[in-house]
């Protein structure tokens, strides 16, 4: 999808500028770090961050985190409807997930009604290939390999996306790979500069 590719490229550029270089706009609209913004060493993150930022956990910023689930495969009527059933392959390479290879019927999705994800939820793979992320662009559900943040505060969407992206990139750089599995509790405990 060309639009998705363009949005992803723009997001990557913004991510690097704001969250790696910390050159987000300051109060005067100038790049924070390049304009002499104060930086302090953060022991938890093992890097310099802008002065005044705290280090809360993801789960303290946004409380509604949903771990996906697969409805019973024994009942074929649970599948083949209009509700995207998002997996890691559907997210990979897509900033926004518009469709999925598999779908759920209303019956299948309603059998696990607490697993519905509203538009704009951030889905993050936490089993197998960890750190693959994308925003669902339709009402959807995911399988159990994915934790999703349902946002109470719209302003946290991009921030948490980029913070998690940086977290997973740093984890991979330090170890050569990212963990094989991450529970919902471990995911909610990720510390970010905020």
Annotate the PLM regions:
Residues 1-28, 154-155, 159-162, 166-173, ...:
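Amphipathic alpha-helical coiled-coil/heptad-repeat segments
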Residues 29, 71-78, 176-178:
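Short coil/turn segments at secondary-structure boundaries
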Residues 39-47, 56-76, 84-119, 137, ...:
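Sequence-specific dsDNA recognition surfaces
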Residues 64-68, 132, 169-173:
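Conserved helix-loop functional segments at active or binding sites
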Residues 87-88, 101-167, 175-178, 183-187:
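A short beta-sheet element
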């Amino acid at each position: 999808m060309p639009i998705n590719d363009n949005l992803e490229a723009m997001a990557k550029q913004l991510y690097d500028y704001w969250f790696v270089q910390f050159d987000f706009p300051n109060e005067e609209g100038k790049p924070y770090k390049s304009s002499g913004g104060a930086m302090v060493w953060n022991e938890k993150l093992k890097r310099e961050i802008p002065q005044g930022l705290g280090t809360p956990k993801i789960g303290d910023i946004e409380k509604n985190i949903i771990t996906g689930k697969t409805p019973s495969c024994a009942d074929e009527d649970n599948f083949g409807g209009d509700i995207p059933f998002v997996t890691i392959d559907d997210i990979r390479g897509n900033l926004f997930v518009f469709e999925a290879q598999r779908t759920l019927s209303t019956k299948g999705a309603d059998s696990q009604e607490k697993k519905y994800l509203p538009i704009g939820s951030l889905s993050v793979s936490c089993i197998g290939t960890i750190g693959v992320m994308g925003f669902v662009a339709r009402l959807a559900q995911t399988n159990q390999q994915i934790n999703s943040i349902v946002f109470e505060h719209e302003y946290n969407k991009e921030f948490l996306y980029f913070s998690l992206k940086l977290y997973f990139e740093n984890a991979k750089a330090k170890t050569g790979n990212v963990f094989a599995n991450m529970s919902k509790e471990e995911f909610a405990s990720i510390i970010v500069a905020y």
